[in-house]
Amino acid sequence: MAELKLGYKASAEQFAPRELVELAVAAEEHGMDSATVSDHFQPWRHEGGHAPFSLAWMTAVGERTTRLQLGTSVLTPTFRYNPAVIAQAFATMGCLYPDRIFLGVGTGEALNEIATGYEGEWPEFKERYARLRESVRLMRELWLGDRVDFEGEYYKTKGASIYDVPEGGIPIYIAAGGPQVAKYAGRAGDGFICTSGKGEELYKEKLIPAMREGAEAAGKNPDDVDRMIEIKISYDTDPELALENTRFWAPLSLTAEQKHSIDDPMEMEKAADELPIEQVAKRWIVASDPDEAVAKVADYVDYGLNHLVFHAPGHDQRRFLELFQRDLEPRLRKLG
């Protein structure tokens, strides 16, 4: 059975850079094993939104902590970034903070890429997925330390070398919302990432089996793939506050179809704020009783997920960390 890990999601769309660093430091002090950060050029909402640069945040947190695993959840290495440069950045961080850095990747969203110069209609999944696979292949080659001449459909290098690379390169975690990418994550990734609140069938019958199939096809032990899930949890001893705290994150309750081509935070905010609080809260575990909260989290462990990263929606994150350490962590550790 894979090791149970508890992580903290640093909400880059909600907090300014310095505060976000301090929250990750506090997460380590409160017993978390990892801290992940999203990589947004623009936040989900305009009013009260933030978008600090993920890689600067990771290095700042790396200097202030000693044991937290640090990674993106997730970064898109395929449009506004050149994957060769991302490979260099993560190799450098891997040298600075050995055995603590991982790169979580996904296929991208219009919100972050069109504002930075992508022209034309936002690509459908087929192209975005092809770009992701090619970028992962290029980064893996560069981390071997050799000179790389790469001639892909989307990316090219000529005699490219990364001179400072930790032994073994950097673990890559691949975000998967369906079985096709989950299978790829098992085959090509060191870990895979999914998010909570989407129904038991998705995890038990699609994502986990597909991930295991991909790993086995690649000759890997599926249990060696770190299975991360971002668990959206609004836990507070005050039930009204637990519900109300979810409101800031209403954009997460928009469907993929509703937000596919939205590239403006103001437009995203407008669409999200039209949703009733009941619909917003459906994506979250909303609880004021610790046993109830842990019972709902335990379902994901039963599905086969071992790295639980907790995303709390409220503005008072220190309160959440204190309540988490007092009420939830002791119960959660018993699940492992």
From Swiss-Prot:
Keywords: Carbohydrate metabolism, Oxidoreductase. Substrate binds at T195, K198, K259, R283. Disulfide bonds: none annotated. It catalyses: oxidized coenzyme F420-(gamma-L-Glu)(n) + D-glucose 6-phosphate + H(+) = 6-phospho-D-glucono-1,5-lactone + reduced coenzyme F420-(gamma-L-Glu)(n). This is F420-dependent glucose-6-phosphate dehydrogenase. Its EC number is 1.1.98.2. GO terms for molecular function: coenzyme F420 binding; glucose-6-phosphate dehydrogenase (coenzyme F420) activity; oxidoreductase activity, acting on paired donors, with incorporation or reduction of molecular oxygen. Belongs to the F420-dependent glucose-6-phosphate dehydrogenase family. It is an enzyme of class 1 (oxidoreductase). GO terms for biological process: carbohydrate metabolic process. It comes from Mycolicibacterium gilvum (strain PYR-GCK). Coenzyme F420-(gamma-Glu)n binds at D39, T76, T107, G108, N112, G177, G178, Q180, V181. SUPFAM superfamilies: Bacterial luciferase-like. Homodimer. The active site is at H40 (proton donor), E109 (proton acceptor). Catalyzes the coenzyme F420-dependent oxidation of glucose 6-phosphate (G6P) to 6-phosphogluconolactone. Appears to have a role in resistance to oxidative stress, via its consumption of G6P that serves as a source of reducing power to combat oxidative stress in mycobacteria. InterPro entries: F420-dep_G6P_DH (IPR019944), F420-G6PD/mer (IPR050564), F420_G6P_DH-rel (IPR019945), Luciferase-like_dom (IPR011251), Luciferase-like_sf (IPR036661). The lineage of its organism: Bacteria, Bacillati, Actinomycetota, Actinomycetes, Mycobacteriales.
